[in-house]
Amino acid sequence: FAEATSKEICERAGTNGAAVNYYFGGKEGLYEEVLIEAHRQMLSLEDLNRIITSEATPEEKLRVFLEHIIRTAMNASELWGIRIFLRELASPSPFVPKFITTAVFPKSQKLRELIRDITGLPPDSPAMQRATALVALPCMGLILFPEKLRTLMLPATAGDAEGLLEDML
């Protein structure tokens, strides 16, 4: 991608040579959208909103959130966005700050609301940030750590979605 021109990207996609510029303002805009879609594959804002705004108790909402993450982790090998995300973790591009503002921050805010409802922690406290990290980071690890390696190194995590869920709760 880094060395490709917008025209080459369009040719490979079988679209008009000007499509990337027209729809995304250039290949940089396209890549920003790719990052947003990669994150959406793991957890869409719509799915998170549905969980957070449900009539369930905060603890039940956390369970549903974790179930969603575990299901995604069990199918992560089918998601092309995971490979993009892993590349960004290994070597962050200049597009990461906008991606965090656009895709990650709104979801993080929703997750903090849920954690606040469970813990009663002040929204901007260091303890809230740590609590959010302690929920979010294991979720990211499950999704991003390749299943073949996870199964090889930690065989008890393979195929035991219910066991993972109970342990995370």
Give the ranges of each region predicted by the language model.
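Helix-turn-helix
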Residues: F1-G29, E33
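Amphipathic alpha-helical interaction surfaces
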Residues: T72-N75, S91, F95, K110-D117, ...
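Amphipathic alpha-helical segments used for helix-helix packing
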Residues: A76-T101, P146-L152
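Hydrophobic alpha-helical connector segments
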Residues: D47-L79, S125-V135
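Alpha-helical structural segments
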Residues: R12, G29-I52, E60, V64-H68, ...
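Individual transmembrane alpha-helices with interfacial aromatic-anchor signatures
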Residues: D160-M168
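Hydrophobic alpha-helical segments that form the core
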Residues: R83-A90, D124-P146, D167-M168
